[in-house]
């Protein structure tokens, strides 16, 4: 298994698919990386040479924020929205949808599970 920017990539996958295992790299970026480093996207990770792995790693580190760096930036951005008290920040704080979706009947994922009702026994008279 090849290790690129701290992520173990499975040997049996094609390189373009394996690169999408890295947080911050999707299909488009994966193909862009391979095009600019001159590596065949259809090649398997197990067939990559050490030189090719270091090429990919260097290109990613020079051009993109990935993994922990990207996660912390996203977290900082959300924290900033909450601190300045804008509408989006308030929605994040309350755990509601941020991008204008309706919430009357949907948004169960964002709102979390419904509070369970406690059933009370009826007294027989």
UniProtKB/Swiss-Prot annotation:
PROSITE patterns given in the database record: RIBOSOMAL_S13_1, RIBOSOMAL_S13_2
Similarity-based family: Belongs to the universal ribosomal protein uS13 family.
NCBIfam families the record matches: uS13_bact
PANTHER family: 30S RIBOSOMAL PROTEIN S13/40S RIBOSOMAL PROTEIN S18, SMALL RIBOSOMAL SUBUNIT PROTEIN US13M
A molecular function GO annotation: rRNA binding
Subunit structure and binding partners: Part of the 30S ribosomal subunit. Forms a loose heterodimer with protein S19. Forms two bridges to the 50S subunit in the 70S ribosome.
Swiss-Prot/TrEMBL keywords: Ribonucleoprotein, Ribosomal protein, RNA-binding, rRNA-binding, tRNA-binding
Cited function: Located at the top of the head of the 30S subunit, it contacts several helices of the 16S rRNA. In the 70S ribosome it contacts the 23S rRNA (bridge B1a) and protein L5 of the 50S subunit (bridge B1b), connecting the 2 subunits; these bridges are implicated in subunit movement. Contacts the tRNAs in the A and P-sites.
Organism field: Thermotoga maritima (strain ATCC 43589 / DSM 3109 / JCM 10099 / NBRC 100826 / MSB8)
Entries under Pfam families matching the protein: Ribosomal_S13
InterPro entries on file: Rbsml_uS13_C (IPR027437), Ribosomal_uS13 (IPR001892), Ribosomal_uS13-like_H2TH (IPR010979), Ribosomal_uS13_bac-type (IPR019980), Ribosomal_uS13_CS (IPR018269)
GO biological process: translation
The protein, known as: Small ribosomal subunit protein uS13
Region (Disordered): 97-125
Compositional bias annotation for Basic residues: 101-125
Cellular component terms per the entry's GO annotation: cytosol; small ribosomal subunit
